[in-house]
Amino acid sequence: MNFYDVQITTDLGEIVVLQVCAYSESEAELTAISMVENGEANVMGTYVTGCFVLG
């Protein structure tokens, strides 16, 4: 597994950057999107090791 930095822009225009541990870039992106959509982006755990909101 590798660490990937995934940047997502929400519907409100906020930029969220998650550091996700995953087997591939696409898996990291899907995990990050799911976490943001479910309101779990601030939950540190097995897959998400860092979360930053830029604006």
Regions found by a protein language model. Give the residues of each.
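Intrinsically disordered, low-complexity Ser/Thr- and Pro-rich stretches
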Residues: 4, 18-19, 41-44
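Compositionally biased, intrinsically disordered low-complexity regions enriched in proline and serine
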Residues: 4-5, 24, 48, 53
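A short, exposed loop/beta-hairpin motif centered on an aromatic-Gly-Thr core
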Residues: 14-25
